[in-house]
Structures are given as structure tokens and as C-alpha cells.
């Protein structure tokens, strides 16, 4: 039985959306634009089209932003070659793509263990954290071996592609995305590289490539953090699948509207924010625990604890009684 994503991809292809003039080029430009937007770029798809196709510098946009997009385009063009050749994913190829991605925006680092440059795709020689107060990523001295093991495992899976369903192929690419950003091999550019690797695999196996829009950024980061804390890849797979379903529905609707047809496409249900879901559940049952809330919502207990702390600080929730045996009170605002 086909998954919802597989059915939607079938509908997308049935309509011939991917057979439109210059579709591949413009879709690639869209991928690049949204990947750099996640990192702070304000350049639009139309502006990238002008810059990429005509070599025109963009007024009002910083040189860093423009180089970020131009460099990522060069990296994607190289990844497309690897995809067409069914080349193995290797440490050297990942370093090559990282060097292209960071060519004009990377930095040099000087450490007690030696110098390295993110502009050259060098593996980091320093430890890094996920923001101030965040958890540290893997120790730098473990990265080379872990990255090699990651490539070997991924290549073993790639060789089984003929026995995998479309949904399984997508999940392999989503897992690769998550695992690479978790290893965090470079001092900078890990997010762009993880999304690029995901797309490389999708291009290789003839899938419609995934995009993560800037509007998805908050939930994207939350999904990465929750997956890392729970060690449950299912969380990130569900986020990526749901996000892709939303984008495909939107693309199909836009296409049908553009050719003057009604769009018989079921619109995605609006996602309920985690904090709103917590409030709703506590109204129904004030005796919910952190664990039962986590099970109901599908996030980690630590994630629930963070939301509860924020809601308490905002005066939305009160705790009545002890942690064990007490209950929650939702403060109704008149």
C-alpha cells in the first residue's frame, strides 16, 4: 500500500509538473535559495535567477549573501554529477562539496593542533556546541572515523536501492541529512551540506528533491533537536515527510491554478503549535505528567519540560501541589 507521500508524488508526476520548460533549473534555484535562507540569506528565487543566469550583481544584497548562493550553486552542480554517475559517498567527496559550498565565505582557524580552513573543506579541529548553553557536538578527534563509518553505512544502503520503496528511499535521504548534521564535520556549513547530501541522494534515485523553506526553520530546528535528544529518527522522518507533503500540495495547487483548473488537492491540515497542544491536553486532564504529554504530542519529555517552563513564566500555567500527585491549572485570560 502506497504512503501518502508516494501517492502525492504520483499525482505530481501524472500532471507533468516536472516536464515544464526549464523546470529542473528553476527547481534547483529554489532549493538553493531556501537552503541559504535557512542560514540568513535574504536573496529571493527571482533574484537568484537574475544573478545565476545573467551574472548580474544584486543591488542591496551583501557580497556574503551573493557568494553564499553562488557557491552553493557550484556545490549542487558538482553533486548532480556524482548523482548521475552513482558515485559513492566518500569523505573526500564530502570535503570537496564542502569546499565549494564555503569557497568564498569560509574562514581560517588557528588552533593548538594546527590550522584549518572551512573554505577548503577541512574537517574541524575544534569542538563546537549547538548555541550558547546547547549540547556539544561530537568531539573533533572522533569525527574522521565517524564520518568514514557514516559513508560506508550509507553506501551499503545505496546498493540496496532496487529493493527499496519510494518512501524508504526518501527516509534513507532524510536519515543521511540528520546523521551528517549530527556528526557536524565542519566548523561552518554543516546545515547546507546536510541538505545538499539529502538532495544528492534524491537526485540519484529519481526522487523529487526536498526543500526546507525559511518558514519551516523553527520546526526544522526543533525536529533536529528532538531527534537528537530522543535518538528517535522517526521524529525527523515524520517532520521531513510532512513538510514535503505540504510543499507538494502547494505546488500542485499552484500549477492547476496557473493552467486554469480547480485544484482537487486536499490541503494540509494546519499544524497545531506544541504549546497550544499542551494547553489543550491540560485543560482536558490537569493530572497529565511530562511523560504522558510527551507521548501524546510526539516529542521528548525534555521538550515538554521546556514548554511547561515557558508557559509557567508567562503565567499561562500554574502548578498546584507537588510534582508527584499535583495537577496543572490553565489560567484562562478574559
Model-predicted segments: where are they?
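FIC/Doc superfamily catalytic core
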Residues: 1-188, 192-334
